[in-house]
């Protein structure tokens, strides 16, 4: 027993303001996206609107620098990845030319050398919002996310309802009162080759698609952790994609953040330890759903997790805590640790700080 406790010792490192992980973001930052290349961090979109910023983490005087604005308009839930020195941004949720909220399936490329954006003549075969993106062998892979037709239809209906609260209530009840499988979340794995700008089918989950999962990859393995199984209902599932050999294998690991799960959590690696932290969800929604209530989160308050879990010996252990619950920020690998930038806390408040989670000998260190 003592040995177990020792292995899960929580070390909460307290630092003065001038020793914070990174300078505060230029604006409170949530629901955006980010990537890192050659120790330079890039973040943008979400609550930052069309703005993008970069920060050289190795600079003596660390500061955020504004970049050229994103040409595709403000967006939430876009994803991004660096491939061969260029930053690619995939999809997201925003307004179309008619002012309607919609899911996009487009791709934009940013060239750091010229500080310029270009919209590629390439469209994914389905919408990309709530999806995850990771890079393997020079290609970007996308999976998960909401169904574009169902999501866009919901917002078209809300737009037509205007300010009629009775009609809006009916639309919401109709939208949320369905089983998880009736939302057709994306369970396909798509690959994007930047050299050809072509999308290809790369496989599909033998289980179900999720939205708002956390993703982390190392070598030939990628993990998808939690996320929504349907609007308002999270899952505690953890999926592993194994690219070892010629055939992609899908595995299901032990669950985490049970029983309700979270969405918008943070995932990363530190000294070969798989980390999962934070996220938001509705406590009691899973029980409601299992009892036949499809509108499972109706009347429930969104809660924000501060838990830090480590994957150890085939199971998840709660191994530490964030200073407060947080979700919907950016997870990046940095200094052999998990770097969290921004996010939102209770009440949906966007934040400007960063957190660094490190693991050594199964001991968690949290630097704020």
From Swiss-Prot:
Q: What Gene Ontology molecular-function terms does this entry list?
A: racemase and epimerase activity, acting on carbohydrates and derivatives
Catalytic residues (positions)? 228
Q: What is this protein called?
A: N-acetylneuraminate epimerase
Q: Its quaternary structure?
A: Homodimer.
Gene that produces this protein? nanM
Compartment(s) of residence: Periplasm
One annotated Gene Ontology cellular component of this protein: periplasmic space
Q: Which InterPro entries match?
A: Kelch-typ_b-propeller, NANM, NanM_proteobact
Q: Which UniProt keywords apply?
A: Carbohydrate metabolism, Isomerase, Kelch repeat, Periplasm, Repeat, Signal
EC main class here is isomerase
Q: Does the keyword Isomerase apply?
A: yes
Q: Where is the signal peptide?
A: 1-19
Family membership: Belongs to the NanM family.
Q: Which organism is it from?
A: Escherichia coli O1:K1 / APEC
Q: Which Pfam families match?
A: NANM
Q: What does this protein do?
A: Converts alpha-N-acetylneuranimic acid (Neu5Ac) to the beta-anomer, accelerating the equilibrium between the alpha- and beta-anomers. Probably facilitates sialidase-negative bacteria to compete successfully for limited amounts of extracellular Neu5Ac, which is likely taken up in the beta-anomer. In addition, the rapid removal of sialic acid from solution might be advantageous to the bacterium to damp down host responses.
Q: Where does each Kelch repeat begin and end?
A: 40-84, 86-137, 139-173, 174-219, 222-265, 287-336, 338-367
Q: Which PANTHER family match?
A: LD33804P
Catalyzed chemical reaction(s): N-acetyl-alpha-neuraminate = N-acetyl-beta-neuraminate
